Amino acid sequence: MAKKSAIKRKVKAPESINEQASVSEQSENEEDEDLLQAVKDPGEDTTDDEGIDQEYQSDTSDDLLFESDEEGNYLGRKEASSGEDEQGEEDDNDDEEEEDEDEEESGSSDDDAKDDQPSGSKATLSKTTGDSSNIAVAIPPRRDPSKPEYENSDTSDEEDIRNTVGNIPMHWYDEYKHIGYDWDAKKIIKPPKGDQIDDFLRKIEDPDFWRTVKDPQTGQEVLLTDEDIALIKRVNSARIPNPEHNEYEPWIEWFSSQVEKMPIKNVPDHKRSFLPSVSEKKKVSRMVHALKMGWMKTTEEVERDKQQKRGPKFYMLWETDTGREHIRRIHDPVSAPKRDLPGHAESYNPPPEYLFDAKEMKEWLKYKDEPHKRKLHFMPQKFKSLREVPAYSRFLRERFLRCLDLYLCPRAKRVKLNIDAEYLIPKLPSPRDLQPFPTVESLVYRGHTDLVRSVSVEPKGEYIVSGSDDKTVKIWEIATGRCIRTIETNDVVRCVAWCPNAKLSIIAVATGTRLLLINPKVGDKLLVKKTDDLLAEAPSSDVIESERIKTAVQWSNAEPEEQEKGVRVVITHFKPIRQVTWHGRGDYLATVMPEGANRSALIHQLSKRRSQIPFSKSKGLIQCVLFHPVKPCFFVATQHNIRIYDLVKQELIKKLLTNSKWISGMSIHPKGDNLLVSTYDKKMLWFDLDLSTKPYQTMRLHRNAVRSIAFHLRYPLFASGSDDQAVIVSHGMVYNDLLQNPLIVPLKKLQTHEKRDEFGVLDVNWHPVQPWIFSTGADCTIRLYT
């Protein structure tokens, strides 16, 4: 049978209003104590299970008793006994304090609650003083089975959630127009999203903008209440979120600190607790038997055995044994690379194709001082039988070098990266899209008997002039390849340069220690006559030249014999001239004498027939010089570096670092912002003068020394000539946008020259108008590529 406990509840009869007022006056003095007691002992709640406050009021002043089961169902009325009266009086005294608090807290809200609740289910609370004081207790009515059990209460926290997608990242719905689904499986459309201007206007106009947040589940904007703001402030200030929580409540001693003399449990001990353990007896007997038989050893004996097994200890004096290098050498050894197996060339009777012919033997002997350049470190030999093979003379040396490699060269494992070759190659435009540029050889100018060192083109592009080691200067017609005039000199012609001024017809020829200014007598006759009139007489000058300049250079008119050949002015230097170059206007020209020390570079003015030495100290062995096409700047190239000087301020502007062994030549872009440098160590260097003093790009397109390099005056082209008999034409576009880097694309390799005495192409020069290029070589020819 289900046990039912009778719950006694007392219902008190109503009292008059005056009596209630007198009770409230008596409780005013104890207000603070009642509030504190209410916090400590909240008392009973008058709310039933279904959330409706109900009160029962009797129709008489007698005390009534009711019985109810554990579920709160009404069982009936019962008379109170004497023992129950005493217990009820004690309960009433405790409940009076609770009634005072309830009256103060709900005094203002009772009248409103009366209007809201039905008249049949509510009654007024009454308070009395005396021994028979009682409180009104709510009697739960029976539930109507026709209504839902949880009609007026929330049964789940999830029923209020509109979006049913669950606890997932909401950015999954960024690409969709909806943000989830409601309880009816309908899409929750995202609210319209404003731009930054709308947000700014709302921030200005809406006073509640600062407390508006966006719900990530629905995308709607939620207005935070005052309670939410207070909660956020408390959390932000590191306080307890619940404001009703008292951090300083009186300590409640749940467990006593006094030592209890009586035991917690009063269970008599078992009989076996007084008897010795049988299992321990067996264990001890086994240990005694093991000691007698010698199987079991003492602690000292065990430590002694461990010490003998470990053996003597050795310590590293300078490093630990747990280092990475020690572990690698012990646990991850790297085996020595094996020597290559012998091939057919190392046989005592190799096939005939592996034996050297005269040309291969000469090439092999040529690298006697540089054996690392040889394809084979030995010369294959053929013997009739194995017994005729002599002892190998380099056996001990090779074994010695092998031993050095084994114990001196560090070993390491390298992870091979599988990188596609196309990924490493930069994406460049197709050469077909970069036309026009020279692709074929059109003409060969033959006539010199020795290597041709220099070539220069007339400003109008009709004639060329060449200088050779056969001590002659030849003038050629470009279109026909016919030699118009040959001028003999007394020494080797190192350099020729046609004046860039189209109003003058002058050629500067560097031969030995003399610089000849020649009128070629080709082209317009009026222009030829004007040039002769200009160079006929020396202009008067009041400037007194120093002895330093007089000993270095002397101006003079040509002899009558040379006048007939076209020579007009002779400038004699104190050292052999290597290079001559013109200024863009055609009035100044510079010469280079590598052996001249601090007077290696000289600048000559044609109109005033005077010279000047720009440098008083030698900064190195000068190789070549160059004028800036626009600015009054002077480029001086030594063996390793290039210095740029301002001729007006007479100061050093910039020093370019080439990181090369020996500079052979240089050429400047027509705009003057980029410089090309050729070196004898097979490199071409592109300098961006506005970017850095180091090369913007280093090109290694040739297999041998690069002797000459040149920019085209009109087209974005440049070319280089090398001792590998090749002329490489490249595309070099320089953009007006300073933020865009130059575009460099190799286009064509023209290799038609013949190699003589280890020399190939000696000089290259562009046609001033057409995309044509002239090259001179050691094969005594001049070749035109178009």
From Swiss-Prot:
Subcellular location: Nucleus, Nucleolus; Nucleus, Nucleoplasm
Polar residues bias spans: 17-26, 122-135
GO molecular function: ribonucleoprotein complex binding
Lyase as UniProt keyword: no
Basic residues: bias regions: 1-11
Keywords tagged on the record: Nucleus, Repeat, Ribosome biogenesis, rRNA processing, WD repeat
Entry annotated with the keyword Repeat: yes
Renumbered ranges of WD repeats: 447-488, 490-528, 572-614, 617-655, 658-697, 701-740, 756-786
A Gene Ontology term for the protein's cellular component: nucleoplasm
Record's compositionally biased regions (Basic and acidic residues): 141-150
Signal peptide: none
Predominant location category: nucleus
Compositionally biased region (Acidic residues): 44-53, 60-72, 82-114, 151-160
Region (Disordered): 1-161
Gene3D superfamilies listed in its UniProt record: YVTN repeat-like/Quinoprotein amine dehydrogenase
One protein family per Pfam: BOP1NT
InterPro entries: BOP1/Erb1, BOP1_N_dom, WD40/YVTN_repeat-like_dom_sf, WD40_repeat_CS, WD40_repeat_dom_sf, WD40_rpt
Family, similarity comment: Belongs to the WD repeat BOP1/ERB1 family.
Functional summary from the UniProt entry: Required for maturation of ribosomal RNAs and formation of the large ribosomal subunit.
Family annotation (PANTHER family): RIBOSOME BIOGENESIS PROTEIN BOP1 (PTHR17605:SF0), RIBOSOME BIOGENESIS PROTEIN BOP1 BLOCK OF PROLIFERATION 1 PROTEIN (PTHR17605)
Database matches in HAMAP family: BOP1
Descriptive protein name: Ribosome biogenesis protein BOP1 homolog
